[in-house]
């Protein structure tokens, strides 16, 4: 690969690695902001959005959960409105349904009130509900109190990703797995794919999701974090008439996970989940998928052991709910008392790419870093699909700035 750059025959100006919604939004934003910029996207799968983008709850998040001023708060609030507009413009299935966040225990009430305050600070309209008012929205849901967030919705994020790919005008190469990267700050970047192709670019953008830290290291940039994969398991509700819209528990602030929730998707089906259990591979969609090299790398990262030490109790509960449908049902019943284990039909799982620092800190905000001729998106789990248009613009801005400076 090293020899190839000496001739400086670039295949593109910007090379994006990763054909999920963030990578495709970045390609779309680059060609919008700087028409004529040549963009190539490399995606190892046979089509777009095969991992985090296509394996989530399909929720357009309002932004209520996130710290005011954080990238998650700013980009989710802006991104939710833009996502609805984008879906409407291109005829992509979506609905603004609103959602309930329900407190089922007394100790959750102060946290619920905290979400009301946070919603107001983030400019999100919120309605507070007493126990009796919950039935106005969800007759089968029980709780001590709740809040209704009107701007939450659902959409087809895979459809959005496909549309971004088409509208970007970028050259998308599927089945192109990155094997090696050779970066020369004075020349550019050459990437070798599994098929033996070499792609030369002036600037590289890393939107590799579950593999973003590996791509960063291949480029020669220490990401100073590791992706620790957490699987989220889902069920489909056999009696969808029990749930009208979206119902969430009050999240535990110690974790960047929102808890098991009920989601009526655009297909009319109701999905229940996800939990959060350590995956034994980066693409470990069930317990049978084990990749010793990836698992070894996770276990070798000091942050993984810090998480285990701090949160073993929470982890043990999640593990129990993963291995026992009865335990999972008990958790769901706190919100939806009428549900039984027979109502839960196993559905496709997702894996969340969670960035973890060396000291065990779970990175709470989106994380974008830069190196010579490179921009790396190193933490973009939920609500990144909702926020993908603003994230894409920010990554594009940095990539174009890098392009202008070379």
Language model: regions and residue ranges:
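Helix-loop-beta segment of a Rossmann-like dinucleotide-binding subdomain
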Residues: 9, 93-103, 115, 128, ...
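Flavin-dependent oxidoreductases
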Residues: 25, 181-290
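Glycine-rich FAD pyrophosphate-binding loop
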Residues: 31-55
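Dinucleotide-binding Rossmann-like beta1-alpha1 core, especially the glycine-rich loop
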Residues: 58-133, 143, 259-261, 271, ...
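Short beta-strand to alpha-helix junction loop
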Residues: 67-78, 102-111, 147-166, 173, ...
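Flavin (FAD/FMN) cofactor-binding core of flavoprotein oxidoreductases
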Residues: 132-135, 226-231, 236-238, 307-380
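Helical element adjacent to the flavin cofactor pocket in flavoenzyme catalytic cores
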Residues: 147-203, 207, 211-214, 387-400
